[in-house]
C-alpha cells in the first residue's frame, strides 16, 4: 500500500486556524527579535510562524519563507509578504488578522449596536469591529464604515462607499 504524505498546506492547517500556535512558535529561545514584540505581533497577524532557524518565518498559507529582518522592518511585514509572494492570498489583505470569519466575529465581543445592524451581517461583508463607537473596518481594503442606521445592508454600503475594494465585487 502506498502512503501519500500530507501536503504542506494541510500540514500547516493547525497554524492557520490557531493564532495561539503561531504565538507559541515565537516563544522559542532562538527567536532573535524577542525585544521587539510589535514586530512579532505583526508577523503573527500576517499568518507567519517562527520555524526555529535564525530569524526565518514561514507563511502558513503560501509556505513562503522570509528572513533577514532589521528593527526598522517592524511595520513592513505585510509589504514584504506581498513583495516576495504576490500570489499569496493573505498578503493581499490590509488586515490579514481578520481574514477568517471567526476572527472578525471575535472582534464584535463588545458590539452594542446589534439592534441597528447585526454583527453576522457585518462579518459576512468582510468587516471587523474596531472597538470605537460603531466603526467597522474592511479586512481587505482597510476602509472604515460607521454611523450605521437601522436597515443598512453592510455589503451594499461597503460596495457603495468603496467600489474599488475587491470584496465589493462579491
UniProtKB/Swiss-Prot annotation:
Keywords: Repeat. GO terms for biological process: regulation of cell cycle. Signal peptide: none annotated. The keyword Cell membrane does not apply. The keyword Repeat applies. BIR repeats lie at residues 22-92, 104-169. Gene3D superfamilies: Inhibitor Of Apoptosis Protein (2mihbC-IAP-1), Chain A. It comes from the Viruses. PROSITE patterns: BIR_REPEAT_2. Pfam families: BIR (PF00653). Disulfide bonds: none annotated. PANTHER family: DEATH-ASSOCIATED INHIBITOR OF APOPTOSIS 2, INHIBITOR OF APOPTOSIS. May act as an apoptosis inhibitor. This is Putative apoptosis inhibitor ORF87. It comes from Ostreid herpesvirus 1 (isolate France) (OsHV-1).
